[in-house]
Amino acid sequence: MFDITNKNILITGATSGIGRAAALKLSLLGANIFFVARNEQKAQILVNEISEISDTKAVPIIGDLSSQTDIHSVAKVFNSLNIPLHVLLNNAGLINKERKETVDGLEEVFAINHIAYFLLTMLLIDRLKEANNSRIVNVSSGAHAFVKGFNFEDYQAKNAYKPFQVYGYSKLANILFTKKLSDILK
């Protein structure tokens, strides 16, 4: 079993849902929790909750994963700490009823659910390599089954927006990325 006592874990999507539950449980197990949050108020609530149940660190890094500039800033903040990253838990995600674009002009669901995972992982890969036996956890789902193959021509859903299809593409991309990353890092 992977002992996480005093290990540094960075979690995206930590202020609600699965990410919040993971942050609380991992802090109880002795991990130092660093997390990305868009909302400072929600971030402070999580810091308070962790400090009530654990003596480990709870450090928010404010940033919006729909913005590639913010993702670079988040990585820069973590990298500036000069500490190893033992676990990167890419958990942030969403599904939209209608097509929305990010500030970078990307379809929002694919940008947050996959591109953010990819970019943040690549920007933190050296910190992960510094840690002995580090882990990258990319949260996905069975939603990849909504799609048959990957539509490289319209993965940004500019021609026809189908919420479950776009979500499925993002989750399929995560699975393919995780598999390739596993092969590369062996």
Predicted regions and their residues:
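Rossmann-fold NAD(P)H-dependent dehydrogenase/reductase core
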Residues: M1-K186
